[in-house]
Design a protein with these regions (language model features):
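Conserved adenine-nucleotide phosphate-binding loops and their immediately adjacent elements
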Residues: 3, 7-51, 62
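A conserved switch/coupling segment of P-loop NTPase cores
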Residues: 51-54, 74-86, 118-196, 204
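A short helix-loop-helix "switch/interaction" segment in the helical subdomain of ASCE P-loop NTPases
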Residues: 204-219
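Short beta-strand segments
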Residues: 62-63, 90-93, 136-139, 162-164, ...
Length: 249
């Protein structure tokens, strides 16, 4: 059996879910999401996304790499599944251009060319249906000039969420993702450091978090793990950061 047929049988013909999937679950958004107890400082943004979902519309979730855009989308998709919200979901990982991305993701495509399969995907998103249709497009990294297929998104009748480092997409409302509050950043580091910090070490961490380069969730996760497994103690960790990260900052 072909993978597309298997996924179709599991997710569209079974009664185990209140969502129907127009695409394979081969997108980053379907990787296991961070548990709520380890998801720090994004409660308001996640609530905003839930409101956007119910309000419908087209949204560009914009921010620098590693700031947490994809994880926010994972949390939203996970919430949709857990709450058994009835809808049709298309989740697409952006690769090369939108046509190629659709061609690799959508189920039940019969066209021989990428162009034909792309327009089949557009048709599936445009179909009238009693359930809400939602497209999640993750890590779109081109402008409309670089990828003209993107211009077709604004005319679709479905709800769309696009994560990107780009700050503008025609027809979309931009929702900027910035660094979490300092208290949340501290928790991200400590959650990955896996050692209890002394008051002095907490003060040191607080000083580091004043610098913009360390106000980055993915960076803090990596530093926390590095501090645990490689540096061994806080003195060495702080020394390495100061000596080796100044050029990056």
């Amino acid at each position: 059996l072909k993978p597309k047929h298997i996924w179709n049988c599991i997710y569209q013909n079974s009664g185990e879910t209140r969502q129907s999937f127009l695409t394979l679950r081969n997108c980053e958004l379907f990787r296991k999401s961070v548990k709520a107890s380890h998801f720090f400082g994004r409660e308001e943004e996640l609530y905003d996304l839930k409101e956007m979902f119910f309000n419908s519309g087209k949204y560009l979730i914009s921010g620098i790499g590693g700031i947490g855009k994809t994880e926010l989308m994972r949390q939203l998709v996970s919430w949709i599944e857990q709450e058994e919200v009835k809808c049709r979901i298309a989740a697409v990982q952006y690769e090369e251009n939108l046509a190629v991305s659709f061609s690799r993701s959508f189920l039940n495509l019969t066209g021989e060319s990428v162009e034909e399969r792309f327009h089949e995907g557009i048709y599936h998103l445009s179909e009238e249906h009693q359930e809400k249709t939602v497209l999640f497009l993750d890590n779109m990294n081109h402008t409309e000039e670089e990828d003209p297929y993107l211009s077709e998104l604004k005319d679709l009748p479905c709800t769309i969420f696009v994560t990107s480092r780009q700050k503008h997409l025609d027809g979309f409302t931009t929702f900027g993702i910035k660094a979490p509050q300092k208290s949340a950043l501290s928790l991200i580091f400590r959650d990955n450091y896996n050692k209890i910090l002394s008051r002095e070490e907490k003060d040191r961490l607080s000083r580091l978090l004043e610098k913009e380069i360390f106000q980055h969730p993915l960076t803090l996760k990596l530093l926390g793990k590095a501090g645990t497994y490689y540096f061994g103690n806080w003195d060495y960790l702080e020394e390495e950061l100061q000596n080796n990260w100044n050029d990056v900052a």
